[in-house]
Amino acid sequence: MLLVLLILAASCRSALPREPTIQCGSETGPSPEWMVQHTLTPGDLRDLQVELVKTSVAAEEFSILMNISWILRADASIRLLKATKICVSGKNNMNSYSCVRCNYTEAFQSQTRPSGGKWTFSYVGFPVELSTLYLISAHNIPNANMNEDSPSLSVNFTSPGCLNHVMKYKKQCTEAGSLWDPDITACKKNEKMVEVNFTTNPLGNRYTILIQRDTTLGFSRVLENKLMRTSVAIPVTEESEGAVVQLTPYLHTCGNDCIRREGTVVLCSETSAPIPPDDNRRMLGGWLPLFLVLLVAVWVLAAGIYLTWRQGRSTKTSFPISTMLLPLIKVLVVYPSEICFHHTVCRFTDFLQNYCRSEVILEKWQKKKIAEMGPVQWLTTQKQAADKVVFLLPSDVPTLCDSACGHNEGSARENSQDLFPLAFNLFCSDFSSQTHLHKYLVVYLGGADLKGDYNALSVCPQYHLMKDATAFHTELLKATQSMSVKKRSQACHDSCSPL
């Protein structure tokens, strides 16, 4: 039996062709392929996008880099593609220019991924400076021959300043006070006075406050070297409602070049005047009936709580398990791209969350983490954190959701990254170990059976929903072996019901 499992594990590794990945490195000057005459060359890219990402380089210090992603055009010339070269030029006080070459580890055997999606890759690099215009251009290799038009794709990208939610973590910005939140409030006390409140910065000891419209209406300096809420009254020369309050800090790290913050002057809320004695008596007479009604309501509520408590004590011995709060079970769900996410995966997720108290992990909900960690690292981390891994397989019978999900370009199904083949290849080595095999479950939607490249999953426990719903729930609750989990298993078994 062990020999059969080993053969199955070995066969599942070679069942699917290896998908190309990228290996990137710096390349200065023309690519070597440019010096060679080519009969045929690959076409240009289909799409090129740029966004900012924050990466940690030391304790409380971050580097801001470009996350450049591109989509390959789905045509026959993709079989000739060897690499993609990306060049970035920046224009500011100092011009910059650098290039990277990303080689594809495998030759492309198809115009699209085996799952049906377009080939998409991304590279994180190229440090980003503040308020700089960048030109990002990319072309495929081998590129066009000399004296021929070279297909390429370019985009412009202007990096924001220190108040951007990503750029504010850049060291230059943090030293200028980008992470400081002064929480400025300003209100018009009267025609001649504005009250400004703000939280000081412990790195500074001096602040300048300007109240401006078309001209400066008021001015004040504040000296404070401790973290505290400060209030200052500033005389103004004319109407101040709607005027701009500009707060300039002078911090040790940035001196006279710190980030200025702004607020707006609004009307101060009116304070209540003392109520005359006659009005006090009148108000007391109006509130007395309401007070009596509230007193009766509180008494009724207390009596109800007492009766409920007594009834709970009398039934506690008869139904001890039903009152237990079941701990959550972490379940990683992987599914092929042909499954309709909204009609099938979401309903299956609701089934796990609502009836068996499961904490569900889906790649659809963690795209940002996948982009930061990479799909292999993300799958490995989630497998270790999960109590169970569920392979969700579709039915052979077409459902109505197919028309709703759609296969047209730009649909959610096309844009979603298919991690099912990668998860299958990554986890299938566990199928030969009885120690790890208990962690994996196969769930069919309808009457389908395993076929094709995923026959290695046949060694895992298999369930058809909703026919095997009860057995599926029981298997889920075997994540731990403690006595409390056995009690929870019975409670979940009694409370679970079909979708």
From Swiss-Prot:
GO molecular function terms attached to this record: cytokine receptor activity; interleukin-17 receptor activity
Keyword Transmembrane helix applies: yes
Bilayer-spanning residue ranges: 287-307
GO-annotated biological processes: positive regulation of inflammatory response; positive regulation of interleukin-13 production; positive regulation of interleukin-5 production
Domain SEFIR: 328-474
Keyword Aminoacyl-tRNA synthetase assigned: no
Highest taxon of the lineage: Eukaryota
GO cellular component: a single term: extracellular region
Note: Evi27 is a common site of retroviral integration in Bxh2 murine myeloid leukemias, localized near the Il17rb gene. Proviral integrations result in increased expression of Il17rb on the cell surface.
Protein role: Receptor for the pro-inflammatory cytokines IL17B and IL17E. May play a role in controlling the growth and/or differentiation of hematopoietic cells.
Protein name (database record): Interleukin-17 receptor B
Source organism (scientific name): Mus musculus
